[in-house]
Regions:
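Glycine-rich beta-alpha junction loops
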Residues: 6, 39-44, 70-74, 86-89, ...
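Glycine-rich phosphate/nucleotide-binding loop
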Residues: 79-83, 87-172
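Glycine-rich phosphate/diphosphate-binding loop of Rossmann-like nucleotide-binding domains
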Residues: 7-72, 81
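Short, acidic/small-residue loops that bind anionic groups at enzyme active sites
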Residues: 1-3, 60-70, 107-122
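Residues in well-ordered beta-strands of folded domains
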Residues: 1, 38, 155
Length: 172
């Protein structure tokens, strides 16, 4: 969950994992999606009561491939196809990631523009930087699917522009 349900019971997070796994199979064509539980460590006993209880439910036979806990630093590394979390924690991860990406691109741009060599390097790598930045651009994604409801619902970011809304409609 990326923010729709901020107070969740462990069984709901398991349901989010089921829906996320089904979405990855049917929409993203991932044959056997791996599901991780977002937590503060990879060990089964890590985390708060909610995380530990959710882990206990997820390690029971489920209709998805549970790979254990996943730390926030691994969220973008592809360690899991689906990362299950309550909406509060998922939204904090999402917004922190957006902020860090924005900060890093700003630092790189500022650093490159400080010298003639940097400006030349930026010019030579312009297309590469543009492609990398585009791969992290939430505008191009449009929004996140709201699973478990009847019909196609895409939740767009609160600060979405016209392009993001267009992409959200296209995604639906």
């Amino acid at each position: 969950d990326a923010g729709a349900n901020t107070d969740c019971q462990p069984k709901w997070i398991v349901q989010f994992a089921m829906m996320g796994s089904a979405y990855m199979r049917r929409v993203m064509n991932v044959e056997k999606p791996e599901v991780g539980l977002l937590n503060i460590g990879v060990e089964a006993a890590k985390g708060n009561e909610q995380a530990q209880n959710t882990y206990a439910l997820m390690e029971k036979p489920q209709p998805f491939a549970f790979i254990g806990n996943v730390e926030a630093r691994d969220a973008l590394a592809g360690k899991a196809d689906v990362i299950a979390a309550d909406g509060f924690v998922g939204n904090v991860l999402l917004k922190n990631t957006e902020g860090v990406i924005s900060l890093i691109f700003g630092l790189i741009k500022g650093g490159l523009m400080d010298s003639a060599k940097g400006k030349l390097a930026a010019l030579l790598a312009k297309d590469t930087f543009r492609n990398i930045k585009r791969s992290f651009d939430s505008t191009e994604i449009g929004g996140a699917p709201l699973l478990g409801v009847e019909g196609a619902v895409i939740k767009a970011h609160g600060n979405s522009n016209a392009r993001a809304i267009f992409c959200a409609i296209r995604q639906a």
